[in-house]
Amino acid sequence: GNTVAAAMERFHSMVDRRAKREPLQHITGHAPFRYLDLKVGPGVFIPRPETELVVQEGIEWTTRHGMYRAKVVDLCAGSGAIGLAFATEVPGSEVWAVEKSERTAQWTRRNLDETTKRYPAIAGNYHLEIADATQMPTLNQLDGTIDIVLTNPPYVPLSDIPVQPE
C-alpha cells in the first residue's frame, strides 16, 4: 500500500491517543532511563527522572563502601529500570528484582531480554522473583547477604493513573 498514507494514519492515531492523555512513552513503547531504552506500555509505570537519582545514589553508596560486586534487591521492580541500570553500570553486581504483578513482570522480562542483548554479562546476575515485597518469606534465602535495597514503589493511587501528567 501507500507508505505515506499508512504513515499518516499511524501518526494521526498516535496524536488521537495523546489527545486522550495516554502517556507518550506508552504510545511510542519506549522510555529512556539512564543508559537504557526500556520498553513500556499499559500495565507498567513509566520510570521517572527522579528514579535515576535512586540508582545514582545506590551506585555511589556501594562504591564508597568498596562493594564492587554488590548484591542488590530491587523491590517493586516494574519495568526493571532500577535493577537493570545498576546491573549494567556496576559490572559483577547481582540483582534480585521483586515484582508482585505478573502483568507488570512481563515488561520486566522484556526489558531484561533486550538489555542482555546489549550487556550479555548480566544474564546470570539478574534474578526476577514474582512475589510480594511486603511479605517476609520473599527472598528469605538471601537473609544477611544483601548489600543494598533500592526501590521506588508505586505511590500513585490507581484512580489517578490515567490522568497523571507525563
Predicted regions, residues:
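Conserved AdoMet
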Residues: G1-W61
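Residue-level signal for inorganic ion chemistry
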Residues: R21, T51, I82, T108, ...
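Conserved beta-strand segments that form the floor/walls of ligand-binding pockets within enzyme
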Residues: K39, A85, E99
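A secondary-structure boundary/capping signal
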Residues: G41-P42, G78, N152
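Glycine-rich phosphate-binding loop signature in dinucleotide/nucleotide-binding domains
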Residues: W61, H65-Y68, N140-G144
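Conserved class I S-adenosyl-L-methionine
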Residues: Y68-G78
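Conserved SAM-binding loop of SAM-dependent methyltransferases across substrates and taxa
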Residues: S79-G92
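S-adenosylmethionine
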Residues: G92-S93, V98-E166
